[in-house]
Amino acid sequence: MKTYDFIGIGIGPFNLSIAALAEGLDGFSSLFLERKPHFSWHPGMMVPDCHMQTSFLKDLVSAVEPTNRHSFLNYLVQRKKFYRFLTTEQRTVSREEFADYLCWAADNLTNLAFSQQVQQVSFDEQNGLFEVVTQRDRFLARHVCVGIGKQINLPDCVTAQDDTCFHASEMMLRTPDLAGKRVTVVGGGQSG
């Protein structure tokens, strides 16, 4: 069984960033495990014409290594969007564009493994290694980073979710008829 220097559990933007930065390190082995079959970033919140609240320079790698091949600017070049982006003088990008960038980066990384549901993590004090067990494999690692994201939090008064009551993370996956109806948003941040 191969021993990795680093195993990441969950592949969201945080661990995707670590994967992109770790990929180019000589003599450093890393593996990132995700239960989903492919990368996706908030698919239920891809509201048309909704823009990021942060600069595109806060991508996966630019703050640490601006010349990394997984930068947002390189994504624009590879997708033949760079000159269009330059001429529009955008300071922020749409959530859909940023999601496409993240998928592009995930598609270009070789240290990601999808459809790998982590079932157990244990630490062997004797050899100083973590053992990470999935439904199909076992891995050993010197270091582990858990980046599984947040779980939705609904008030106790919400007993069922349907097209009349749901979490904002599912907004674009549902098709409620809101015409002429009153809508209440509970919470804030990205959804409020």
Where in this protein do the model-derived segments appear?
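Beta1/beta-strand and adjacent pyrophosphate-binding region of the FAD-binding site
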Residues: 1-14, 179-189
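Glycine-rich FAD pyrophosphate-binding loop
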Residues: 7-9, 19-46
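Short hydrophobic core segments
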Residues: 7-9, 118, 132, 138-152, ...
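Glycine-rich nucleotide phosphate-binding loop and flanking beta-alpha elements
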Residues: 15, 39, 120, 151-152, ...
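Glycine-rich active-site loop/strand segments that organize a redox cofactor
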Residues: 33-99
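Glycine-rich dinucleotide-binding loop and its adjacent helix/turn
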Residues: 94, 148-192
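Helical element adjacent to the flavin cofactor pocket in flavoenzyme catalytic cores
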Residues: 95-113, 118, 147-152
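A conserved short coil-to-beta-strand element within the FAD-binding core of flavoproteins
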Residues: 114-130
